[in-house]
A protein has these predicted regions:
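Beta-strand-rich assembly/attachment modules of structural machines
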Residues: 1-295
Length: 295
């Protein structure tokens, strides 16, 4: 069974443009990759609401965006978490896709899946493979995050509606939601499985909840060194647009990164730790994909 077809209720883009890009950005900040729902809010957003936009990014990262694979997991697993032909790592397509009406980020990603299936004839399937992972476990001190207020409404519908709206500056009304900000992380009414999923971005491996803890927590994590920061440097070196910024980045940014604790150090103060082990990891295998024709 392929994953090329999504739900019949998935809305479609009103306008979608796909153009091959063979140039390099003069400004590294010109690189763009994201989908933002019409209910997202952030002063840092450069993508208009209700759109998916990619610029100067290899197709592999676009597919990863559509199927919710964090970029920080692509390189540590050496391509095994998203396998396909070599050209998806080097060919760059700028995509601008605008939704017709109000949409969430989760809906936009489903719409992007449909767009990739239509224009790139993308067909893929999911598999579960045994791979290195981290287990999130408690220390003897126990979890130090405060329990979330019990009178807060946090059903599964709320989780589906807000889980992907990571750009929000306010968590009012949200549950199972996170707001990353310059390496720090705030979570409102999240369980340990939610937290493990988010930690995968920082740790560079899939994190599986093994705490056995029930209930919801309000989480406030300090800025940490993210595996994604190292991945971005590596990707800039290996991709077709390498050299646009340089491996080390601005000297000031390097000092800032070096001053932060790792996610492993930061977790200890909250009564948690990550243990290296093996476990099931969901991977995407591309069965077929074609280079699209120009618009």
């Amino acid at each position: 069974m392929t994953a090329a077809v999504t739900s019949a209720q998935t809305p479609s883009f009103e306008v979608a443009s796909i153009k091959k890009n063979t140039s390099r950005p003069s400004d590294p900040e010109a690189r763009t990759l994201g989908c933002h729902g019409t209910n997202s809010h952030s002063p840092l957003m450069t993508i208009p609401l209700g759109r998916c936009t990619t610029r100067f990014e290899p197709l592999r990262l676009v597919i990863a965006l559509a199927y919710d694979i964090p970029p920080s997991l692509l390189y540590p697993y050496d391509g095994k978490i998203l396998s396909g032909p070599d050209w998806i790592n080097s060919e760059i397509y700028d995509i601008e896709a605008k939704a017709e009406g109000p949409t969430t980020e989760a809906q936009l990603k489903l719409m992007l899946q449909d767009l990739l299936a239509d224009r790139f004839k993308l067909k893929l399937h999911r598999e579960s493979r045994e791979m290195p992972v981290y287990a999130l476990v408690t220390t003897k001190a126990g979890i130090k995050f405060p329990a979330a207020p019990k009178d807060r409404e946090c059903g599964e519908q709320v989780r589906r509606d807000h889980r992907y709206e990571l750009g929000a500056t306010s968590l009012a009304g949200q549950c199972h939601g996170f707001v990353p900000d310059r390496g720090a992380l705030t979570g409102r009414s999240v369980n340990m499985n939610d937290f493990a999923e988010m930690l995968s971005i920082w740790a560079g491996r899939v994190v599986i909840d093994k705490t056995g803890a029930d209930g919801l927590f309000d989480i406030k994590m300090p800025p940490v060194i993210s595996a994604l920061q190292d991945v971005v440097a590596l990707e800039r070196k290996e991709s077709a647009i390498a050299g646009a910024r340089g491996d080390a980045g601005p000297a000031g940014a390097r000092v800032l990164v070096d001053s932060r604790p790792t996610v492993f150090n930061a977790l200890d103060q909250f009564g948690l730790k990550l243990e290296s082990t093996k476990g099931p990891v969901d991977v995407l295998v591309i069965d077929s994909i074609q280079k699209p024709s120009e618009n």
